[in-house]
Amino acid sequence: MDTPKLTVVALTTREARIWDAGIDPHSRSVVVEAPGHRRNVHVRAAQEEQLHHRRIDDPAFYDKVIGGLPLTGDILLIGHGRGKANAMLSFVQHAERTRPDVAARVVGAIDNDLTSMTEGQILASARLWLSHHSLMR
């Protein structure tokens, strides 16, 4: 029996990393940056970015993420944040309102501190979730 295709989306308020070609340790992600977000190298610019937070529920950003997803297959979300800062929850709510077909494909969500994780660790977390989820079926 073939396993369904799983797309992993690691989502923060600033970017989404999408793995749609598998979750093996050497898979590469596609990065979707939030509109208006730029990486600053000057210390003052970096301070400005930290002090002035952007909207969590940015529809233009979420539409870009949805546009970067494959048309079929299951979706596993990985994110962090609590309450109003939870981009993963805001993304699902946006998808439910605008693209219920995409929202229906979300099969799971993992709450991890993405700021301290490498891409390999994110994929390892997805593999662990998949192995546990497969055992539950």
What residues fall within each predicted segment?
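Terminal alpha-helical anchor/extension segments at protein ends
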Residues: 1-137
